[in-house]
C-alpha cells in the first residue's frame, strides 16, 4: 500500500470503530446527530469536498455528487447510521479499487523497470556513469554483471549470460559472445561486456517498448467508449429519476388519491435509488480490465498497442502467416545427407572445407553441420563458380560442391533428390559421392501453435511464401496449415491478404503474423498485424498492432487467449453490474430494497467487478 492508501485505511478503521461504539450507546436526538457526524466527516470529508467542487465547476453529475446527496439526505431523515455506513462502505470500495489499479500499475512498472538509469563509458582507465541519452552511435560502453544493457549494440569483448525475462517473458537465460547483437533492457548476469552502440538511446529497443506501453491507454476499445458515453447520460438520468421518485408519488397521493403524501418514505426510496445507481462498478472495472489485460500480456512478452487492438485480437478467426522467420527459423540447416560409398561425416567434411572461404548462407550451414574447427591450410585452388557452386582441392583431392549444373559441367551425373529443399551435390575426383539436403526448418513449436490455434476456435490458418510450391506444400503439410500460397512477391502478399479480407464476415477478424522484415505493408493491411520477434525492426514495431517480444509461435496463441479472456471478463462485468443494478433499482423504487441493499448494489458489485477485472493480469502458461 502507498501512503495515501494507508491513510485511507486508517480513516476507515476509525470510522468503523466509532459506528460500532455509537450503535451500542443509548443516545438519540441532537446528541446522536452530533456524535454520528464525527465518523461521517472522518470518512467522507473528501467526497463532500469533491462534490462541492464539482457543483462549483458545473460538473455536477458524478459518483461524488451521488454519494454526497444520498448520505446527506439519509442524515436529514435521521437515518444517521445508514448515511454514515453508505459513506464508509463506498470508501472501502474506493480503497479496494485503488489497490487493484495500483497492482496493475506495478505490473506495468515491472516492465518499465527495464529503463536504464545510466551507461558506463571508459575514460582514462576508469568507468564514468553518463546519461544514456548522451551516448552517441558507435561509442563503446561497458556493462558490468547485474547491470541493465542501456543501449542496443554489438558485443566487442566478453562472454556472458543474459536475463531477457523483462523483454520476452521467458525465464531461460541466453548466452552471448563477441560479435552477437545485444538489445537494451536485458540484464547482464555474469561477465563484463564491452559493447559498441548501434543506435541512440531514443531509438533503442527499450525506448520503443516503453513508448508502446505508455501510449497503449490512449487507444480505447468500443467497450470503453460505450461505458464513457453510457456514464455521461446515465448519471444525470438517474439523478432526475431519483428526484421524480421523491416528488411525483407524494404529489399523486395528495392531489389525485387524496392520501397522506408520506414524503419521508419516498425521499428515503429516492436516496436508496441514488446509492444503487452509482456507476462505479462499470466506470472503474471496464478500463481496469483492459489496463490489467495489457499489463498481463506485457509481462508475458506480448505488447498490445491499445485496448482497441485487444478487442480486435479477441475476435480473430483467421490467422495468416508469412513462412520465413515466422513458422520457420529463416536460416538454412542441413536436414539430410544421402551418400554412396563415402561416409556421411566424410562428405560433410569435404563439403565444409571446400566451402570454407565462401560467405554464402549455404556455406555457413555446411560449416555448422560439420561442427568441427576448419583448417583452411588443407584447402587450395579454390574456384567459386557463380550460380553453380565451388571447386577446390582438399588434402590434394579435387572436390566439387554445388548444384546439378556444376555436376554437368564436370561431366558427373547427379542423382535426383525427391525431397523438398536445396540439394547440394558432392563429387570427389570426378566421382559422384552423394548429395546434401539443405532446408529452412520449421521452428520447434510451430506445429503445436497451429494445432492450438485451431483448438481455440481459429477457422482457418493460411501461409504465404515466396518459396517454390513443392517446398511450401511440404512445410504446410508438416505443420498442419490449412491453406498455402507460394511463389509470392511482397506486393502479392498484400493482394492475397486483401482477397482473404473480402471473403470473411465483418465480425470475424483476420490477423497477419510476420517477422517484420518486408512485412510492414501487410501488417498494416490486416485487421490486426502481429510482428513476431520484431524488437530490432522499427518498421515492424511501427506498422504492427501487436508486437511479440521473441520469435516463439506459441506467443500468438497466448496473445489471442489473453485477449479473449480479457473481453470475456469485460462482458461479464457489464452484464453483472447492469443486471444487479436494474434489479435493485426496481426493488428500491418499490420500497423492497433498503439502504443496506443499496450499499451492496454499489460497493459490493464494484468490489466483485474489480476482483474479476484483475484476473486479466494473470496469463496462463500454455
Q: Which residues make up each language-model segment?
A:
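Flexible metal-binding regulatory segments at protein termini and peripheral loops
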Residues: 1-31, 101, 110, 125-127, ...
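Conserved ATP-binding TGD loop and adjacent catalytic N/P-domain core of P-type ATPases
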Residues: 396, 422, 428-572, 580
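P-type ATPase nucleotide-binding
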Residues: 334, 338-460, 469, 481-497
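Residue-level signature of catalytic and energy-coupling elements of molecular machines
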Residues: 51, 79, 100, 119, ...
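Actuator/coupling domain of P-type ATPases
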Residues: 29-31, 36-122, 134-136, 140-141, ...
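Conserved catalytic phosphorylation-site environment of P-type ATPases
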Residues: 66-68, 167, 268, 278-354, ...
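Bilayer-spanning, highly hydrophobic alpha-helical transmembrane segments
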Residues: 12-16, 225-257, 270-290, 571-600
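Juxtamembrane helix-loop transition segments at the membrane interface in multi-pass membrane proteins
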Residues: 52-60, 99-109, 288-307, 616-622
Amino acid at each position: 500500500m502507498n501512503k495515501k492508501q494507508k491513510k485511507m485505511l486508517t480513516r476507515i478503521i476509525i470510522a468503523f470503530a466509532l459506528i460500532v461504539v455509537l450503535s451500542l450507546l443509548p443516545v438519540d436526538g441532537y446528541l446522536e446527530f452530533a456524535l454520528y457526524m464525527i465518523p461521517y466527516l472522518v470518512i467522507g470529508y473528501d467526497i463532500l469536498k469533491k462534490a462541492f467542487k464539482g457543483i462549483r465547476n458545473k460538473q455536477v453529475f458524478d459518483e461524488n455528487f451521488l454519494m454526497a446527496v444520498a448520505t446527506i439526505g439519509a442524515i436529514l431523515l435521521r437515518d444517521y447510521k445508514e448515511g454514515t455506513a453508505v459513506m464508509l462502505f463506498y470508501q472501502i470500495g474506493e480503497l479496494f479499487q485503488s489497490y487493484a489499479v495500483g497492482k496493475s500499475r506495478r505490473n506495468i512498472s515491472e516492465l518499465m523497470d527495464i529503463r536504464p538509469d545510466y551507461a558506463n563509458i571508459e575514460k582514462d582507465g576508469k568507468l564514468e556513469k553518463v546519461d544514456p541519452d548522451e551516448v552517441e552511435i558507435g561509442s563503446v560502453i561497458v556493462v558490468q554483471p547485474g547491470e541493465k544493457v542501456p543501449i542496443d549494440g554489438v558485443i566487442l569483448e566478453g562472454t556472458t549470460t543474459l536475463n531477457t525475462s523483462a523483454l520476452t517473458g521467458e525465464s531461460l537465460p541466453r548466452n552471448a559472445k563477441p560479435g552477437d547483437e545485444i538489445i537494451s533492457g536485458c540484464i547482464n548476469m555474469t561477465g563484463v561486456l564491452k559493447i559498441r552502440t548501434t543506435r541512440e538511446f531514443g531509438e533503442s529497443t527499450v525506448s520503443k517498448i516503453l513508448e508502446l506501453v505508455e501510449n497503449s491507454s490512449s487507444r480505447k476499445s468500443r467497450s470503453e467508449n460505450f461505458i464513457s458515453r453510457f456514464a455521461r447520460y446515465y448519471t444525470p438520468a438517474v439523478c432526475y429519476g431519483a428526484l421524480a421518485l421523491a416528488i411525483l408519488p407524494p404529489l399523486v397521493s395528495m392531489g389525485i388519491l387524496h392520501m397522506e403524501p408520506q414524503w419521508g418514505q419516498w425521499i428515503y426510496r429516492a436516496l436508496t435509488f441514488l446509492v444503487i445507481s452509482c456507476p462505479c462498478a462499470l466506470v472503474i472495472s471496464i478500463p481496469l480490465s483492459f489496463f490489467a489485460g495489457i499489463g498481463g500480456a506485457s509481462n508475458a512478452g506480448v505488447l498490445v498497442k491499445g485496448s482497441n487492438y485487444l478487442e480486435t485480437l479477441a475476435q480473430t478467426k483467421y490467422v495468416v502467416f508469412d513462412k520465413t522467420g515466422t513458422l520457420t527459423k529463416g536460416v538454412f540447416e542441413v536436414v539430410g545427407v544421402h551418400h554412396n560409398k563415402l561416409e556421411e561425416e566424410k562428405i560433410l567434411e569435404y563439403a565444409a572445407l571446400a566451402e570454407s572461404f565462401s560467405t554464402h548462407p549455404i556455406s555457413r550451414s555446411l560449416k555448422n553441420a560439420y561442427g568441427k574447427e576448419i583448417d583452411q591450410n588443407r584447402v587450395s585452388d579454390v574456384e567459386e563458380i557463380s550460380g553453380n557452386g565451388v571447386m577446390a582441392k582438399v588434402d590434394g583431392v579435387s572436390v566439387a560442391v554445388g548444384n546439378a549444373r556444376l555436376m554437368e559441367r564436370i561431366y558427373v551425373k547427379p542423382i535426383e533428390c525427391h525431397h523438398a529443399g536445396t540439394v547440394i551435390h558432392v563429387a570427389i575426383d570426378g566421382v559422384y559421392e552423394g548429395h546434401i539436403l539443405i532446408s529452412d526448418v520449421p521452428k520447434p513449436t510451430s506445429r503445436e501453435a497451429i494445432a492450438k490455434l485451431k483448438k481455440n476456435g481459429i477457422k482457418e490458418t493460411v501461409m504465404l511464401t515466396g518459396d517454390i510450391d513443392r517446398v511450401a506444400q511440404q512445410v504446410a503439410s508438416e505443420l498442419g496449415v490449412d491453406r498455402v500460397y507460394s511463389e509470392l512477391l511482397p506486393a502479392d502478399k498484400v493482394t492475397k491478404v486483401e482477397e482473404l479480407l473480402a471473403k470473411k464476415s465483418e465480425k470475424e477478424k483476420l490477423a497477419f503474423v510476420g517477422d517484420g522484415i518486408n512485412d510492414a505493408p501487410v501488417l498494416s493491411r490486416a485487421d490486426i498485424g502481429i510482428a513476431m520477434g520484431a524488437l530490432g525492426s522499427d518498421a515492424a514495431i511501427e506498422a504492427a498492432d501487436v508486437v511479440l517480444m521473441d520469435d516463439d509461435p506459441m506467443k500468438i496463441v497466448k496473445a489471442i487467449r489473453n485477449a479473449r479472456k480479457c473481453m470475456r471478463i469485460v462482458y461479464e462485468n457489464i452484464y453483472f453490474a447492469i443486471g444487479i443494478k436494474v434489479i435493485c433499482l426496481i426493488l428500491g423504487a418499490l420500497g423492497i430494497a433498503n439502504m443496506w441493499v443499496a450499499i451492496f448494489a454499489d460497493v459490493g458489485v464494484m468490489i466483485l467487478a474489480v476482483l474479476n477485472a484483475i484476473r486479466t493480469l494473470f496469463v496462463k502458461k500454455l
